[in-house]
Amino acid sequence: MDGVGKSVKLCGGPIGYIYATPKCSVPVDELAILAAKSNDCDDAVLPLVAGLTVESDFVWNVAAVAGTKTTGLGSGGTTLKLVPTHYHPCVFVFYGGDCIKPCTKAPNLTKACDLARERFGYSAYSSPAPTAFETTGQQICEALEMDAQNVMLYLVVTELFKEVIYLCNSFLHFGGSDVVTINNADVRRIPIYPLHLVLPDFNRITNEPFSEKPRALGEGAIMPKAFYNDSLCRLLHGYVLSTTAVGLRVRNIDAIARGAAHLCFDENHEGTLLPADTTFTAFTPAAETTKGQSKMGKREGSDVSGGGYERRTASLMASDATLAIENVISASVYEDPIPDVNKWPIYCNPVGYADRIEALSAYMARVAGLVGAMVFSSNSVIYMTEVGEAGSTEGKETSTTAPSFYRFFQIAAPHLSANPLVDRDGKPVSGENLSKSTSASQSEYSLDYLILACGFCPQLLARFLFYLERCDGGAKACHHDLDTVKFVSSAIDADMPCELCDKTSRIYCAHTTIKRLVYRLPKFGYQMRGAMGLFGAMTNNYCDVNALGSYAQFSTLKRSEGEASRSVMQDTYRLTVERMMKALEKEGLLTCDDPTNMASADANIRDGNSFIRAISTMKNIIESEASQLMRNLTEIREYNIREGLGDANHTLSLAVEPYASGICPVLAFLSRRTIIAVVQDMALSQCSIVMQGQQVEARNFRTQFQAVLKRRVLELQNAGFITSKTITVTLEDQQICVPDPSKSQYDSVISNMEGDLVKVTVEIFRELKVKNKVLFGGGIAGAASEATKSRLAGMVEAYQRPTKTMHVLNGPLGFAVKRYHTLLFPDVKMPNGATPNALWFWILLLRNQLPAGILSKEEEDKSLFIKKFTKSYADMNYINISPTCFGDLAQFYLANTILKYCSHKHFFINTISALVAVSRRPRDPAIVLPWIERPITKGQDVAPAAQQLIASMSDHKDIWCATFSSTNLVGSIMTTKPFVVIGISISKYHGMAGSTKVFQSGNWGNIMGGRNVCSLMSFDRTHRYVMTCPRVGFVAEQPIFSSGIKETTLIDRVRMVLSEESAAPHAAVYMLALKMVGDRVRQMELEDWMEITNDEYISSLIDELNKQVEEAEGGWNADAAMTLAKEMVNMAMSIPTDGPTFDFDACDENLEGHADGQTISETNLKRPNMNVFDLEPIPEKRVPVLSVDML
């Protein structure tokens, strides 16, 4: 939205269209990859994509006709009411969808949704009108004179009016149908208008839409037949209404529809939207734990004033305010266009794939990694189903008695949703029994929890299963012995009863998928306020994700009068990084487009001399750039380099606009649930403020203060987290073409009427800003609670930099000495003739166990150079990550050099990494079960069928699975404007004493679940992750803290092995994998070992070892693999002891020094003014109320 001006022109138009397309022109193969469609229903949800579901010139912003109003006292004239809005990012197929292939073979998903809906107490779908009033798909086809057997019908609807269509308050103007071109085929479309076109001055939902002569009918007007289609209403009830109802905790789903639809017609509504008889889940919130004592709250329903009643009131008011603010967002207009399939690089030019089907399938497997993360994370927004309440001090950061922003908060509690229902007073609803409440302790995952998150929508559930089927079972991250193939085989032979499947469909059953992923699925029970796992997309070109984030940014630098902005930008840290990277690219060490790619360095490093020359050149370039930056900042820009470091943040932004995530119904759903969760978090933070000093139990409290709460939430914009922009909306043409109210809806007569916008200024929610402080504050505020002080003390310990010596293999050049070992030391051989690999060589060398005389003088110099560089880097290093490529090394070295200039000491800085979703062909038989096509009736047939499918994988274009790679160069990933999954906790605070302005900070937090979410993720307080899936180059053009027991996993054990100084760590890791995952090691490839070890060199050695076992006589088996690995270990341990050894320590007697000692040469740095740099440590900045999240 950066490009949106202050004024936008809109054309008046209908509230939606019914598209009628011939089935023969439907690109069914492409739509099958993008659609949400279950196996037991023909209805489907598709993305709104130009060239695929709508025409290429489709206009997504519109001034929609909301009704008419009379003008003048006696003139009898009428004008149109026009409301700015945009089109919903999905379309709804309600007839003829049988031509689209279901996205999963899982049977009976509609039945599963109905059973879960009944279990959790949400209202079931009931027809909003009698069958006699239905406009069937066949009738629509007949009116269009099209063959009903060969037509597919779908709804394209504006965001504001989707609930209006569900409530049958609209009609089809058959006479106004026209023809558009989609995918080189003629497609008919019928405009949809609200009934209020013939009901002037009627500002609410009509409860008698099928009455031929309602009381409000305009003079001379003919009442059209209201549009009601049962399949469409059922689809809207599931995908639109139920998902919102679950997010807002409202069991009466029709109440959601009526509340949202009312706002379409009454733009001045300020009262409540949700009914007073809304029910709530009965549960006891977790009280705070202090001094080791657990103070349990009272039973639900017996809470005194200020307890359960206020929590339920806050829950209802937050839901009501969110529903109203959703209307504000729905009335936004966006410059960013809807997706256009003809501009998707993988669609138009699928380089590297057989065709676009294979390219799309591979990309959707990437997306599966992020969707899986939202399912596997226990703090994902899709599970935020209840409101918790803090104890007496838990929600406060200080001991003051002022109302806390953190008293009420959302919790992930699907395990409580089946509890009995109570009213706002805490009394059980008729027929409910409070004694049947579920314990709030940790609960095992159930398919019903996923169905609840999907809003009981079978189409959405099917699409989620589509993605989960492409996620692995977590064998690398979880220590378990589950063999899904054997489990399914046994279940088929035993004919185990299942409500959803029989023997022939057991391999496809949703329960089978859940069982395969059981070790990755979350457990619930934690009721404390924390970070939420959000989904979004980056559309902004700007973010600060380099090592020092927003340090020395443009807005903080002094600018001389008349000086060009371009000149000032040259003295920013951001441009310094770019300049450094370009200089290194010129030297052939990396490429700026992909700085993790080592191909350029491989071409330039040919021997030891070229290696030393490359490292020395890089060091000189970085120190020169750092010196110049510091000089300019202090002498020209008058920038306080120390305080600036304390203010620096890593920043990125998530777009609010819907179309960036609009390529799939699940992504659109996740984006919407994120907005709902964020708005509710804001609303709940204001509830305790609104309630303070008021009689919350009073009958009219909600009526009086609901509008106050909404206004307070809207005032939180542009205060640190949610950014918005106010624009002026005007009409392209005051004369709007609409159906003549006095004619039949089948008549083609058009009336030109004058239109007026109900509002000319529109508030557009733009972005959610995420921040991560570069420096750890380290201070403990005196007024902080004991719990806060305890947490801060733990953080201080985690950030404290240890004084241990950095190992060469784990140091700054570790990646390089392993990669180029054969070039650096090509002639080094042991006395027994063995050629040591990099690991063995450096372990022996650093232990002074390498036999004397095997290193030449030149080789000694090379090893000493590496050791000196490692020590020099270690002395000034405050980044708790080892570089993995020259791009990492360059950015870390520059950051550490700047930190040295600023005399930074003691604490590690915060670092960030991106986990990038990638796709590959599956090798695990358990993953490919959903793709088996031949009928399975015997358990013994499952394994052979899976193996046969794996053997013929190249013949199946659609079979791909998700995996991840890791990079510390987050900036290069953000240029692809990726989809993002990230943990965020939102802090709220007053700007200064006495101020009523509430500011917020979206703090970069953790995605709960650790390696269950992604095997590359590890818990480290100094390290933050963002999970990404690139969009640019695929579906977008190139633009000009966890509680509980920590399980010991394969990756944990491997990292422990690698931290030990073993001469053959690759063999040790291989043996460990054989012990923990057994025969599955055979299926593991280089990418798998990369995930486990996070070391390319070691991974290549293990992969080679695995191939040696495969090629050995007798083929691969676990015993042979273990024997070969043991031989490797024994050979590495055979150190000659009959002669003198090379004393490596004696080579660097002058290198001893302290960790915080001076290591950067004064002459090299050429500091212009020593007094500028020899300052005291950075002063701590403290505010009266310090949020732990903000540290």
UniProtKB/Swiss-Prot annotation:
GO biological process, one term: DNA replication
GO terms under cellular component: host cell nucleus
Region (Required for nuclear localization): 1166-1191
Zn-finger segments (unnamed): 498-511
Alphabetized GO MF terms: single-stranded DNA binding; zinc ion binding
Region (Disordered): 288-307
Record's keyword terms, sorted: DNA replication, DNA-binding, Host nucleus, Metal-binding, Zinc, Zinc-finger
Subcellular location: Host nucleus
Motif extent (Required for filament formation): 841-842
UniProt key word Ligase: no
Listed InterPro entries: DBP_sf (IPR035989), Viral_ssDBP_head (IPR043031), Viral_ssDNA-bd (IPR000635)
HAMAP family in alphabetical order: HSV_DNBI
Family assignment from sequence similarity: Belongs to the herpesviridae major DNA-binding protein family.
Function: Plays several crucial roles in viral infection. Participates in the opening of the viral DNA origin to initiate replication by interacting with the origin-binding protein. May disrupt loops, hairpins and other secondary structures present on ssDNA to reduce and eliminate pausing of viral DNA polymerase at specific sites during elongation. Promotes viral DNA recombination by performing strand-transfer, characterized by the ability to transfer a DNA strand from a linear duplex to a complementary single-stranded DNA circle. Can also catalyze the renaturation of complementary single strands.
Assembly information from the UniProt record: Homooligomers. Forms double-helical filaments necessary for the formation of replication compartments within the host nucleus. Interacts with the origin-binding protein. Interacts with the helicase primase complex; this interaction stimulates primer synthesis activity of the helicase-primase complex. Interacts with the DNA polymerase. Interacts with the alkaline exonuclease; this interaction increases its nuclease processivity.
Protein name: Major DNA-binding protein
